Structure formats: C-alpha cells, structure tokens
Regions:
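N-terminal binding-site loop/beta-alpha segment at the start of enzyme catalytic domains
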Residues: 1-65, 131
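Short, acidic/polar
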Residues: 14-25, 85-98
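Distinct, well-ordered alpha-helical segments
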Residues: 45-56, 117-125, 144-156
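Active-site groove signature of glycoside hydrolases
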Residues: 100-115
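Conserved small/polar residues in nucleotide/adenosyl-binding loops
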Residues: 157-163
Length: 166
C-alpha cells in the first residue's frame, strides 16, 4: 500500500492537509510515498511539498520510507522535456531529487512508453540511473503486456545490473 501524491499534494492544496495525510498514513504503517515529476497541480509541486515535509519533520525516518518518483510526461518545452530519452529521464530525476531534497529515490519509474525513443535507450538510461546511485531500483509504469515483455527482454540482454521481475 502506498500514499499517492497525484492531485492531493500540489500548490492548490492546503499544506496542513497534505502534512496530516502524510502523518496519518505513516502512523498507520504506510511507508511508501509515490510521486512523479509532473504531479501537482503545478508540475513538480507535489515533490516540493513532500520535500518540505521530509526536511521539517520526517528526515529522521528516511530509512523507513520508500520514496518513488516517475518521469515521462510534459515537464518543460523543447525536444527533451517529455517522454523517455536518456537526457529527459536523467534531467527529470535530477530535478525531482532537488525538489524533494534527497540524494536518491528508492524506486524510479519510466511513466509511459515513448513511441519515438528506442526502448533500449530508455532501459539503458534506467540502468545508468541505478548505477549512478540516484535510484535503488527502477521500473516501468503504464506499459501494456507486450511493451513490458519487450522492456524485460532488453533488460535481460543489455543491462549489467540484475533485474527482478516484480
């Protein structure tokens, strides 16, 4: 079970409500907080708000928390502000880490398949993110069965890190 930050933790929400939701979840044993770079509303604001909560009150519990984030949707204009290129995924994660005030996330997901970037580039970028220490684990989100099988095949063929199929 995780607490999702999609539309509940953006700039349009009341900060005290966000804080209370986090603490209620944590006090009831929910330690997985799930975010994405574009969660808000205002893209990135959910990560900023969690970062504030972490800094002010939950930093001593970081080792008990699983923080996940995702990238794959629009974040900035231009050819590298969206989808699944290596440049976009790494830049997005770097910005997410900065917003949350973290050195790493526990899980980083590619949020949706990219029809224009070779799957091998996306999967290798995820592998590189783990190797860099910016994420402990990586995964995919919103991939259908065939896309998941293809991504797994690429990972088994091209990655240097072992993969776990869950």
């Amino acid at each position: 079970v995780s607490l999702g930050f999609w539309h509940n933790f953006g700039d349009t929400g009341v900060y005290e409500n966000m804080r209370q939701m986090c603490f209620t979840a944590f006090d009831h044993g929910i330690t997985h907080f799930d975010l994405a770079n574009n969660y808000g509303p205002q893209p990135g604001s959910a990560e900023e708000n969690l970062g504030k909560i972490l800094r002010e009150e939950l930093s001593s519990y970081r080792d008990e928390l699983i923080i996940s984030s995702k990238a794959g949707f629009d974040m900035w204009s231009g050819p590298y502000g969206n989808w699944g290129s290596r440049k976009y995924l790494i830049a997005s994660l770097d910005q997410s880490l900065k917003r949350m005030g973290l050195d790493y996330v526990d899980i980083f997901y590619h949020h949706r398949p990219d029809p224009n970037t070779p799957l091998e580039e996306t999967v290798r970028a995820l592998d590189g993110i783990v190797k860099s220490g910016k994420a402990l684990y990586v995964g995919i989100s919103n991939y259908n069965k065939e896309q998941t099988i293809a991504a797994a095949a690429v990972s088994y063929t091209h990655l240097t890190l072992p993969t776990t199929p869950y």
